[in-house]
Amino acid sequence: MNRSGTMSKREVDLEQYFTTPEIALSCVELVEKHYDLTKFDNIFEPSVGAGAFLQHLPIRTIAIDIDPEMKCNYLGDFLEINFSKQRSLFIGNPPFGRRSSIAFKFIEHALPSAKVIAFILPNSFHKANFINRLPTNLHQVDSLDVSGIWNGNYLNLTFFIYEKRQEEREKIVE
């Protein structure tokens, strides 16, 4: 964000809406309500940005970002990284994209290695047409409304916790 309080062109192009440390803490605490973080093979923050989630996650968390100016320990495009572990936690605030297209790509890319995907996403992920676009073996465990001012813009957002399971969930018929 520049001195006038508006987003820079770089932030807009990379869809950088940084999570506050307070929101990140609330999100991590919600995950910890359901899971022991030490039981995951790996923990990935796929779009680390300024590192708000890292303050509240174990030191072994792998922080990924495409922007070299961010607090990552792995510089690169999350969507081009291959993951091998099967019981991983993916947590963070990925870019959304038009009609959440990038957010869906992040979810789909994480899924083969994920046990849990916990992302800040637009409130539209509560709607049947968005839920039905998610892989059917991904089940919502919990959520937290994190709507508010993000980099000078009011955004309707929710922190969703999804768990990958063997059983398929039913599609929602409207």
Predicted segments — roles?
Residues 1-174:
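Class I S-adenosyl-L-methionine-dependent methyltransferase catalytic core
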